[in-house]
Amino acid sequence: MSRFFAGGSDSDDSSSDEDLYGSGSESGSDFSQDEQDGGDDNDDDMSDDSMFADDSDDDSDDDEDLGGKGASYFLKSSTVADSDDEEDTGKKTVLSAKDKLLAELANCSKLIDNGKRINDWVLIQGEFDKLNKAMERFTKQRHGLPPKVYIQCIVELEEFLNTQLEDKAGIKKMNASNSRAFNTVKQRVRKNNKEYEAAIAKYSSGGDVAEEEEEENKEDKPKPRAKDEFVLTAPSQASNEEFTTVGKAGKALVSPTDMFKTLKTVLESRGKKNTDREDQVRQLENLLPSASTVYQKISVYTMLVSTRLDLSSASAALAPENWLKVVGDLNDLLSILEENIDTYHVIETAPEIEDVEKGPVAREDGVKLIPGSVASLVERVDDEFTKALQFMDPHTTEYVDRLRDETKLYQTLLRVQMYIEHVSDEKDTLGLARILVRRVDHLYFKPNNVINMTEQIAWGGVKGDSKATPRPTEKDLTSSTYPTTLISNMCSVLYKQSNTVFRTKAMLAHVYHYALNDEYYKARDMFLMSHLQSSIASAEPQLQVLFNRTLVQLGLCAFRSGLIAEAQQSLQEVCSSPRLKELLGQGLAKYAQAGVVDKQRVLPFHTHINLELLECVFLCSSLLMEIPFMAAHNTSIDAKKKVISKLFRRMLDYHERQVFCGPPENTRDHIMQAAKALQRGDWEAARDLVCAIKIWSLLPNPEAIKAMLTDKLQIEGLRTYLFTYWNHYSTLSLSTLADMFQLPVKDVAAIVAKMIAQEELPGSLDQKTNSVVFTQAVQQTKLQQLAVALSDKVIQLAERNERLVAGGYQFDKMTQPQKRKTQRAR
């Protein structure tokens, strides 16, 4: 460190270089403190700490001869400098970094004393924090042991605190802010003073380590000569201990003791209020160049990743640049672990390390176990990525750019999985299951070609192989069956776990993937055999959302396969609910006051199921089911009570009540007008309206879907026509029906025969004439139906009154408690 001083004499009796360091380090703090307190009883300490330490009589005489402009004059601390002298001389005092820190410590100590006089604990708390930060910088710059001004301040503060604790009446009289500050200072002082127990004990006994260290080297240092007004003095070899050893790029190297002390400090301050997390990250980043051993690097990287993740909050995700740094640090940690996989293992079940600085003791096989969890780190990184997508506008390019980072995350998950497989016990598969369930979450909803591409990128940057999910070949990555095999392998491991959450999530994801690939019967059988319908109501909200998504995807799969009835049954419960978005994890309730936890349950946008497509499929399925059913029960008095889809019936009734119906504008209008056309038997108009819906382009094979819908509309149009107009015919030719609905005669005959067999249509088939002969039954008018219903109700009422008059015949079968209850009610 450079020292500037000015001298007006060539005398050799000037202060030595050690005197300069000593007076600069202690004078600005101790002298001002002693002067504030009215002096110190210990004359030796006063002489050592004072700026104006008395030298020999000869030295003082020389200084007097030079008019008080010797070297010691220009080393006055800024806190005690005489402004009049500075104005007279016009000289500027240049302070070193150490002098400035000591001056700052002295200033904080003075303000703390002022706060003690007026009992202002808010001021004391603020200045105490500043004091500790200055002391932290003092330690980092390796200026030596804690100075006396700092030790004296914390000792006196603790004594004053103990005195205040005895005055309980005064504590009760404090206001809220002062009381909170008092409790905070009490906790911090006790915790802080434990770190300086040795220095405090030495101070209490009357000594000072910092002064003794300087006194040892004081005699060996030559006194500098002042040749000019300002002279740069080169430090001697004896003062090398006060300089910091630096590495590459001039960065200071930290000793192992200081390194693990910093790690301990960061660990203890995590999760506390008023903690500067960014400063903690900077501290850990500064430790990386000093980490020379593998154990030190692992310790620093593990703490650095966790601390970076703490930069996020509950209501905001981690910034993209910080998230990328976390992924980079985690990959660096994995690289170190993979390179030293035969000597170091980071596992959760590792025993606690007795000597943190020396590291863990090696086992018989030479492996050293470090307590930690790589799986937990990558889980938090995955959660931060999901949170970022949740709180981001999905309709911007930023969302797409952020989504590209998923491949980096997936590759990191794969590396962690391979590491856990190597270091963990074969019987302990919990850590492996935690990673596999994350991989399943990233893959189960994606098409096969996207899964193949993701696997190709992930395995391209990873060496080695995996037992649970072997490395795919080039042929596998171009196959459409590899994604199904991959998900089956991962789910098979999850099925063996004792944790029901893992098993349930694996089952639902497996069913979802089968349904997405149009394997309806496999998905349906697996879904029914799981018996999740009976227990899902008590599951976690996230599992309930996944259950609803799987059920909806099963219905979409049935619709694509042409199974209209199965599709309608699967979609009925979810699509009829007004909380559709909330049930699928794609939004919140309309008028609900959602908190942060509720918002985090919403899935990222790229995993959503298109709600417009879902509504279109459900309404089309209800159309093909409800219109023939309405036509079959049109003459029944209880026709309105027999409903397949209440939602569809309500929409249709609303559409019929409209005075004027314009051209269809949306999906719902197309389907409602198609329903009215189908009721008339005009299947062609219904087909044109349904096929005109643009949402079909989102399905994999839209033309095949439209062809399937055309066939279904022809069949259901034929059934609706027969249900509506059969009583107007005595016989009806099958060829005529075939021409009307453009169906083969064989198909028409099969449909009519099935309706007759199920007693839906009164009549019979005449094979000679190739026609259907209807049986004309007696048809009741609307008035007759109402009269019959009224007579039935009157008869029931009369019978009940007769039993009541007879003495309560209907109560004979009741139990005795029920009879007493009925009698009390009377």
Swiss-Prot record:
Protein name stated in the entry: Eukaryotic translation initiation factor 3 subunit C
Phylogenetic lineage: Eukaryota, Fungi, Dikarya, Ascomycota, Saccharomycotina
Cellular localisation: Cytoplasm
Record flagged with keyword Plastid: no
Coiled coil: none
Gene3D superfamilies with a match to the protein in the record: Winged helix-like DNA-binding domain superfamily/Winged helix DNA-binding domain (1.10.10.10)
A GO term, aspect molecular function: RNA binding
Domain PCI as annotated: residue spans: 605-779
Region (Disordered): 1-71, 205-227
Species of origin: Yarrowia lipolytica (strain CLIB 122 / E 150) (Yeast)
Biased composition annotated in UniProt, kind: Low complexity: 21-30
